[in-house]
């Protein structure tokens, strides 16, 4: 070998060694670090949650603005480019509340205090806002009491048809636990009631002992919340509530059908028990209370104040190195009806933990391929307002650039992992859950405990309108995820949802918070870092097939044909399989980019610009809320609405509309197949 060749060989060898020594590790190395115990910090999570829940922080208040500044400071100290996006939105607050019961004509009236008992030593308990319903109608009404169980449509049908009870002119009392409170008020109004009282029944929320001795709701506990049936600022439907924007009048808002037309109040189990003792009559099957009417008479008086209030979304950004114009978005809301230890600030603490771990990764040299955006929303409790206004303002950018939205709301309320998602994310969630230890059983992964709880992994869908994923999934068509440990908790939306409850019952060691940050953050990292976006549309096709089979099994008659729907799903399955083969053979940055665009945009194809009939804001034809329960999730919501209407009217036109809605869904699925294939017809 010549000297020149020997020298060249030595230089090449040294160069390779130098490159191997100082080149960045693979992305998977950073992902392993992210979920390692060395990166997690239980004490930091606890400190952040304690700070956030020190005072009640309803949207539009000084306390919530202070909480926003705290979140922003943590984002900034975690090397996120942070800023606040403010909106001016219409919110309501209570001015006057009164509830008076006259048991019989000769009995002395009983005036309820409408207060939650102050338990424990919380120094800020006096700052808790009086119990009320957001956007409740002001008014003074009186009527005999009628008990309507959970206030569902079927409960009112049973009262009228099976029990002969006339609700017209009555004040309805119904219990929480099955449907969204705004739908309870709406159903009562449509049945003829003049007012509504909603309470937390001991059968659903109580126990032999209660907080602070146990996790259960005290007898004086009251679940507050909004009764608004829309999303976003009621005065700016479809556009953002920026300074100087167009706004609907109060009259136009009422005509929209999204705000209640009769007054309502939330009450405690203790107050409800007094009211229900004055009701006589038949008892509905499976229940314990007579339905009335009366003889007890309720006088309900409520005056609310509507104000244009400033709300603040806190946004933190880590710009992508290779694809800065592709966004992986994580979000949680900050505002709470009271202290908000579970709802929502367990999620806020998780989001902050993720921010702090991402900072540690950046200090080790990690940079995301795609941009990661952390969003802390405001005014969610009033009607998903902060997230909806932001989505409406950024609709076009999100439609063309958002990869996925990962939501965490009530992140921790107890044991047991739960996930909801659009189906192309199912496999990614399962894989992430296989890599994180179960916080309640260190011998198993979250996935092993999850599958062991029901012999299979159950991933629910994001059709309901219960949290901030709604605008992303149901309005724009961005793939989405929502996760939690625990599902439902007794002191929901009461003054007892505080740090003490979390520390004693929800997550004493804050290990569930840490685990949630690991799973959610790992899903985000994979979406942000993997060369090809890890979406699996075969899962989507299988899920749609199940929904189509359920529809077919209804045997609707009236010449309803679902064959076009089934064919479109078969086409989607074929396209998904083709994508899998394409991934294995693809080469070149432009080809990868084009494939990722197809994976990202296929979900958008499942939306329709005209939206659902009578609910045009909801654009997604596959997943949307039930018409009669905003919390309830429906597959093919437009078809479901049409079937319900046809069963009521039983006219040729109404059944033809069912077929039309099936055609609409079929076309949307076919469009998604074409997007996945990258074909022009």
Swiss-Prot record:
CDD domains: M28_PSMA_like, PA_GCPII_like. GO terms for cellular component: endoplasmic reticulum; endoplasmic reticulum membrane; vacuole. Its EC number is 3.4.17.21. Residues 241-527 are annotated as: Catalytic. The chain crosses the membrane at residues 7-24. It is an enzyme of class 3 (hydrolase). It comes from the Eukaryota. It catalyses: Release of an unsubstituted, C-terminal glutamyl residue, typically from Ac-Asp-Glu or folylpoly-gamma-glutamates. Residues 25-681 are extracellular. SUPFAM superfamilies: PA domain, Transferrin receptor-like dimerisation domain, Zn-dependent exopeptidases. Zn(2+) 2 binds at residues 343, 381, 493. It is a single-pass type II membrane protein. Zn(2+) 1 binds at residues 333, 343, 409. It holds the Pfam family TFR_dimer. GO terms for molecular function: metal ion binding; metallocarboxypeptidase activity. One of its GO terms (biological process) is meristem maintenance. It is found in: Endoplasmic reticulum membrane. InterPro entries: PA_dom_sf, PA_domain, Peptidase_M28, Peptidase_M28B, TFR-like_dimer_dom, TFR-like_dimer_dom_sf. This is Probable glutamate carboxypeptidase LAMP1. It comes from Arabidopsis thaliana.
């Amino acid at each position: 070998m010549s000297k020149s060749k020997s020298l060249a060989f030595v230089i090449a060898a040294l160069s390779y060694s130098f490159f191997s020594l100082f080149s960045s590790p693979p992305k998977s190395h950073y992902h392993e670090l992210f979920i390692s115990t060395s990166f997690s910090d239980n004490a930091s999570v606890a400190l952040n949650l304690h700070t956030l829940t020190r005072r009640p922080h309803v949207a539009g208040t000084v306390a919530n603005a202070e909480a926003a500044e705290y979140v922003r400071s943590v984002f900034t100290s975690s090397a996120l480019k942070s800023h606040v996006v403010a909106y001016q939105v219409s919110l309501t607050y209570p001015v006057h509340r009164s509830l008076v019961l006259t048991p019989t004509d000769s009995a002395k009236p009983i005036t309820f205090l409408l207060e939650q008992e102050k338990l424990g030593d919380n120094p800020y308990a006096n700052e808790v806002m009086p119990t009320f319903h957001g956007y409740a109608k002001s008014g003074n009404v009186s009527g005999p009491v009628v008990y309507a169980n959970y206030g569902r449509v079927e409960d009112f049908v049973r009262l009228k048809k099976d029990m002969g009870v006339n609700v017209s002119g009555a004040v309805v009392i119904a219990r929480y636990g099955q449907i969204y409170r705004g739908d309870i008020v709406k159903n009562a109004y449509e049945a003829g009631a003049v007012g509504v009282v909603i309470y937390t029944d001991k059968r659903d929320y109580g126990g032999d002992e209660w907080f602070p001795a146990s996790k259960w709701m005290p007898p004086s506990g009251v679940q507050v919340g909004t009764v608004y049936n829309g999303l976003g600022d009621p005065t700016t439907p479809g556009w953002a509530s920026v300074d100087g924007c167009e706004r609907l009048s109060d009259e136009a808002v009422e005509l929209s059908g999204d705000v209640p037309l009769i007054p309502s109040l939330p009450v405690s189990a203790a107050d409800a028990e007094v009211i229900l003792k004055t009701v006589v009559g038949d008892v509905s099957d499976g229940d314990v209370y007579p339905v009335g009417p009366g003889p007890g008479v309720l006088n309900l008086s409520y005056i609310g104040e509507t104000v244009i209030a400033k709300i603040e979304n806190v946004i933190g950004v880590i710009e992508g190195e290779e694809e800065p114009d592709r966004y992986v978005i994580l979000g949680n809301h900050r505002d709470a009806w009271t202290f908000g230890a579970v709802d929502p600030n367990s999620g806020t603490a998780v989001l902050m933990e993720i921010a702090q771990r991402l900072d540690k990764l950046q200090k080790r040299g990690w940079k995301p391929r795609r941009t990661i955006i952390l969003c802390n929303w405001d005014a969610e409790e009033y009607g998903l307002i902060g997230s909806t206004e932001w989505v409406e303002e950024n609709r076009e950018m999100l439609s063309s650039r958002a990869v996925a939205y990962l939501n965490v709301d009530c992140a921790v309320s107890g044991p047991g992992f739960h996930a909801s998602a659009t189906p192309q994310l199912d496999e990614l969630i399962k894989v992430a859950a296989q890599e994180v230890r179960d916080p309640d059983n260190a011998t198993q992964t979250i996935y092993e405990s999850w599958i062991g709880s029901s012999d299979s992994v159950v991933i629910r869908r994001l059709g309901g309108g219960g949290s901030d994923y709604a605008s992303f999934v149901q309005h724009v068509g961005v793939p989405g995820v929502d996760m939690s440990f625990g599902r439902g908790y007794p002191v929901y939306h009461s003054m007892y949802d505080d740090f003490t409850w979390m520390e004693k019952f929800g997550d004493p060691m804050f290990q569930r918070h840490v685990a949630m940050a690991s799973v959610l953050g790992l899903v985000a990292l994979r979406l942000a870092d993997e060369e090809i976006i890890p979406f699996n549309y075969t899962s989507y096709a299988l899920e749609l097939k199940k929904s189509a089979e359920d529809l077919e099994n209804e045997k609707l008659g009236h010449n309803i044909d679902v064959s076009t729907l089934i064919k479109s799903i078969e086409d989607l399955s074929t396209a998904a399989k083709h994508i899998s083969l394409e991934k294995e053979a693809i080469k070149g940055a432009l080809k990868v980019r084009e494939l990722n665009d197809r994976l990202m945009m296929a979900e958008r194809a499942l939306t329709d610009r005209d939206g659902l009939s009578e609910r045009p804001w909801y654009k997604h034809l596959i997943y949307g809320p039930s018409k009669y329960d905003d919390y309830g999730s429906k597959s093919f919501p437009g078809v479901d609405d049409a079937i319900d209407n046809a069963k009521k009217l039983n006219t040729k036109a109404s059944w033809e509309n069912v077929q039309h809605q099936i055609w609409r869904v079929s076309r949307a699925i076919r469009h998604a197949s074409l997007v996945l294939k990258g074909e022009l017809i």
